Amino acid sequence: MVEKTSKSSAKTEVAPPAKVIELGAAVSVKELADSLDTNPVEVIKALMRKGIMANINQVIEFEVAKGIVEAAGFEARLKVLKKSAAKKVSPAKEKLSNFPLRPPVVTIMGHVDHGKTRLLDAIRSTNVMEKEAGGITQHIGAYQVEIKGQKITFLDTPGHEAFTAMRARGAQATDITILVVAADDGVMPQTLEALDHAKAAGVPIILAINKMDKPEANPDRVKQQLAEAGLVVEEWGGDTLAIPTSAREKKGINELLEAVLLIAELEDLRADPNQPASGVVIEAEMDKNRGPMATVLVQSGTLKLGDTVVAGTTWGRVKAMFNDVGKRIKKAEPSTPVALLGMESVPQVGDKIIAVATEKQARDMVNENSQVTRKTNAVSLTNVYDQVSKGNIKELNIILKTDVQGSLEPIKDSLEKLSTDKIKININRSGVGNITESDVMLAMASGGLIIGFSTGIETNAQRLADAEDIDIRHYDIIYKLVEDVEKAVQGLLEPTIKEVIDGRAEVRAVFESTKKLSIAGCMVLEGKVLKNSQVRLLRGGEVIVDAPSNSLRRFKDDVKEVVAGYECGVGLKDFNDFQKSDILEFYHKEKSR
């Protein structure tokens, strides 16, 4: 048992002060058990009594861990980090020109049917260095090719979801984007979406006009359509290299790779291979045989076998590394993609990964990262002025969606005129129709917000926006829309109050307590229910009462929260009229960012 009891003594003694156990804002079950000098199974049992299911690697919040510690007769104290552990390991900033060149990192984007995958296969089959591993390949989400003695790293990510996830967490993994457009189909909506993401990333774009073997191929039409979208090819006076290709016939592949090397030379891409490694997670999964596996793109330094690394809210020691063809390697230099084993848990795509000196330093960094809410770098109308004042941003990126084309241009023009000497307003995407998941992804990637005028939002888009804390504003009066943005850049916009549903529970039985109060025996349906939360009781879809909860119990124990799938007893202040099948919504209110 985790709880400790003291035997009665014949003599009255002054109890010694309780041992103080310092914990981070988040702690794993194993770490908590080690701190208590007890078996992790006992901690798991104690959590179960509180309605929390956990395994040995589960991370729990400080308040939950505190209850376990106090039940064991100790005092819990939140460990406060005096200095950012991340800052201690940040590589020294030196002139990049002193460092050796590194391979460029390239992402291929475009419409799903325009030959993007076949183009990747053509590049891989003609140039990939497969012979090192006897032809045995392993998909790790990235691979390297070599042309004229120079390496190029390709990120083989589906769509632009991973691309967006990396940028949404502040990780810039790509140096160059290849935009693939089919010469017969021309520019499609998904092409424009990919172009928006590439522009938002601020990286050079190479145009691959694919399917040139088709009799109906019309490359000039592609160039014209892209020019109308703001991407002008070199031969028309712009900055974009356009390479005709045929993935089917493997034509134009070498020319495309040479274009990549040309851009890389102009960009002068360099990195220091002699510092502690840092990079970004580009794929991550739980391998049923080998445990947590992360594919990492090393961006600076050299990652070595045995290194202790931190990625977001997890850490580990590099037990094994594999290159893009499945060969075990002992080190990985800048721009090298590797699959590594040894993480405590699965990191998130887009997490920055960094090598540290000690396990203690790794734990401190994980603790610090756990104290920071994992949200995107998106701003909101409410906080944009503060962000500008602090020097965090110099641009306000907006995705604008309207009901009709006639509304789009005047709103767009009005917003762009609100730019000041301190902040520039960019309309990253404008279009007609509902707000889509792609719009939210672009807002995530660009650190922007979304404005809808007389238009709706798709369910998946709303769900993603809620999860990633993307600010979406809806208007049906143009002057109000423009006025709010103007006030926002001047710091005059009042914050709005929003309601957040924490969890829902259904009443399954009603009990009378000894104090003549009714207690609702409930099953938590979703989320989590909290003691002292505001609760809305719904009966037949109608609100019967809105009151604070004053009692939350599991069996005979008072608890602070109960999660979905567990039963609990709930009491509401000054309310006794519970009925079976009533729905209880637990919620809180907070200011929008």
UniProtKB/Swiss-Prot annotation:
Q: Which SUPFAM superfamilies match?
A: Initiation factor IF2/eIF5b, domain 3, P-loop containing nucleoside triphosphate hydrolases, Translation proteins
Q: Tell me which UniProt keywords the record has, alphabetically.
A: Cytoplasm, GTP-binding, Initiation factor, Nucleotide-binding, Protein biosynthesis
Q: Which GO terms describe its cellular component?
A: cytosol
Q: Which residues, if any, are the signal sequence?
A: none
State the residue spans of region: G1.
110-117
Region G2: what ranges? 135-139
Specify the domain of life of the species encoding this protein.
Bacteria
**Can the keyword Cytoplasm be found in this entry's annotation?**
yes
The entry's GTP-binding residues are 110-117, 156-160, 210-213
- Provide the residue span(s) of the region labelled G3: 156-159
What the entry lists under Gene3D superfamilies is as follows: P-loop containing nucleotide triphosphate hydrolases, Translation factors, Translation initiation factor IF- 2, domain 3
> Where in the numbering of this chain does the tr-type G domain appear?
101-270
Annotated compartments = Cytoplasm
Q: What are the boundaries of the region G4? A: 210-213
Q: Kindly name one Pfam family recorded for this protein.
A: IF-2
For this UniProt entry, the molecular function terms from Gene Ontology, in alphabetical order, are: GTP binding; GTPase activity; translation initiation factor activity
G5, as annotated region: 246-248
What the protein does comes down to:
One of the essential components for the initiation of protein synthesis. Protects formylmethionyl-tRNA from spontaneous hydrolysis and promotes its binding to the 30S ribosomal subunits. Also involved in the hydrolysis of GTP during the formation of the 70S ribosomal complex.
Q: Hey, which family's this protein in?
A: Belongs to the TRAFAC class translation factor GTPase superfamily. Classic translation factor GTPase family. IF-2 subfamily.
This chain's protein is named Translation initiation factor IF-2
